[in-house]
Amino acid sequence: MKIIGIGNAIVDVICKVDDKFLINNKLIKSNMKLIDELEFNKLLNNLKIEETVSGGSVANSIVGLSQLGAKAGFIGKVSDDDLGQKYSQGLKKENVEYFYNKKKEILPTGTCLILITPDSERTMCTFLGTAGKINKADIDIEA
């Protein structure tokens, strides 16, 4: 059986924070907020990265199916940057075939800051980057 998902290719950037960090940055605990590149960089400059992993809801589901034994693939758009490389390597490690046209993009690879407070609540700040710009030209139908 083969299953292919298409979605936003997002690198999850996991950081531990306290409630004060959320308040100081006007973030609502346990919510997800779409942010631009400027806000992403502003937040990231004040954080210590714990871990980065390939993410995005569709890709996460495809990885789960792969772990259950399905032959799985994912279509999503990343840039030819460090995070884009990390994203494709992460899917490969999970035995997910990744279909994409690797090229330099104007926008960087999409990222989601996952801010974890001491009570294990997650607050997410997502910058879609190039993931939000996927189009027909990015999909290789012959693959």
What are these regions (language model features)?
Residues 6-7, 75-77, 116-118, 125:
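Short hydrophobic segments within beta-strands
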Residues 46, 73, 79-80, 97-100:
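Active-site cofactor/substrate anionic-group-binding motifs, chiefly glycine-
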Residues 53-60, 83, 105-108, 131-136:
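Short secondary-structure boundary/capping elements
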Residues 80, 85-92:
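Short, electropositive alpha-helical surface patch
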Residues 90-107:
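A glycine-rich helix N-cap at a beta->alpha junction
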